[in-house]
Regions:
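N-terminal secretory signal peptides and thylakoid transit peptides that target proteins
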Residues: 1-14
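Mobile cap/lid helix-loop segments that gate and shape the active-site cleft of serine hydrolases
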Residues: 60-69, 199, 215-249, 255, ...
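Short beta-strand element of the alpha/beta-hydrolase
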Residues: 92-100
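Catalytic nucleophile-loop/oxyanion-hole region of alpha/beta-hydrolase
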Residues: 107-115, 131-166, 306-310
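Primarily recognizes the serine-hydrolase "nucleophile elbow" in alpha/beta-hydrolase
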Residues: 154-224, 241
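Short beta-strand/loop motif that positions the catalytic acidic residue
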Residues: 259-261
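Conserved alpha/beta-hydrolase "acid-adjacent" motif
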Residues: 267-273
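C-terminal catalytic histidine-bearing segment of alpha/beta-hydrolase fold enzymes
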Residues: 275-332
Length: 332
């Protein structure tokens, strides 16, 4: 099925909110291992895509050492989608999950689908976000990931009844550059970064809770240079750098936040990133918790935690979420 024949989003005539069509799949956007249910983010051309023609989505292995046979990275994302992972026993909560990859690719499995399946086991409905990459030709590249994150939050919350969700229990998790996106939607949820395309865009985009994992936070001193350049371009203005240095964007309405990071992370340094963000959360009195593991490196996700203290982070998150009333099946 090509894009022209894909089923789009429709507005329900007799209800206050729009409803999703039954199936949202597109030919080159469906990959092996995708669940049966996939939500196309935009009903037409995504913002900033005028005149852009991307080749089909590219799937390749992560660099060695390979972790699993399905340790995939993807790029050339012209059609942003959410893969829907429904639990057998839903508890009414949900998480949108944004894989990392330095804003140049996305680690589809160990920071995406594997994570979704893990939290399905706790009753959480998960949506793995395949967001557009800013350096692939989109206009206003700096806002492209945030556009998709805002739209994803609005689609999930706008269809809470369809998925059996509590609108107040919908969070956003991200890893590395995806952690930057998680912090972006937590602090910039009401920034006007695209023109409304339908009634979903009137829905609140603020996450109920935020989970930036070993996140990129600052784009100034101490930044992960690759993520900064891929998001903002090679010579960004100070205004842009400040806008997306998210430790400066925290306010009292930033949602409750759980952070996990390893002290020996030499890729995205904890001090100017995760720890600076946690400090800003504390200054603004945002309910927040950070776990600074002695060892674990960068990008531990799920696959690199076996036999290590970092293996505890999913249960720590579940207990934290339960303490705030977001998750019902976690044991405190």
């Amino acid at each position: 099925m090509d894009r022209r024949t894909a089923i789009g989003l429709g507005l329900a005539a007799a209800v206050a909110r729009p409803a999703l069509a039954d199936t949202l799949v597109v030919g080159d956007g469906v990959l092996p291992g995708d669940p049966k249910e996939n939500i196309l983010l935009w009903p037409g051309l995504p913002p900033g895509g005028e005149g852009l023609s991307l080749p089909p989505i590219r799937v390749h292995n992560h660099e060695p050492p390979f972790l699993t046979p399905t340790d995939r990275a993807i790029d050339r994302i012209g059609l942003p989608v959410m893969n829907v992972f429904r639990p057998d026993k839903p508890d009414g909560s949900a998480m949108i999950i944004a894989p990392g990859g330095g804003y140049s690719r996305e680690m589809l499995d160990f920071e995406g689908m594997d994570v979704a399946r893990r939290f399905n086991g706790a009753g959480i409905t998960c949506f793995v976000l395949r967001y557009r990459l800013p350096g692939e030709g989109w206009a206003n590249r700096q806002h492209v990931p945030l556009q998709d994150a805002q739209r994803a939050m609005r689609l999930v919350r706008g269809n809470a009844a369809r998925y059996g969700l509590d609108e107040a229990h919908i969070g956003f998790m991200g890893f590395s550059a995806g952690g930057h996106l998680a912090a972006s939607i937590a602090t910039c949820f009401d920034d006007n970064v695209y023109k409304a395309v339908d009634a979903f865009d009137q829905v609140d985009a603020r996450p109920s809770f935020s989970v930036p994992m070993y996140p990129v936070i600052t784009l100034g001193e101490g930044a992960h240079v690759g993520s900064r350049n891929n998001l903002l371009g090679p010579n960004p203005s100070k205004e842009l750098v400040d806008f997306y240095s998210l430790q400066t964007r925290v306010l009292a309405d930033t949602p409750p936040t759980f952070i996990a990071v390893a002290a020996d992370d030499t890729v995205v340094l904890p001090l100017p990133n995760a720890l600076a963000y946690y400090t800003a959360l504390q200054v603004s009195r945002v309910p927040s918790e950070i776990h600074l593991f002695e060892a674990g490196g960068h990008g531990f996700g799920l696959a690199r935690t076996v036999g290590r203290p970092t293996a505890a982070w999913p249960d720590m998150l579940l207990r934290w979420g339960a303490s705030h009333g977001f998750f019902k099946n976690a044991v405190l």
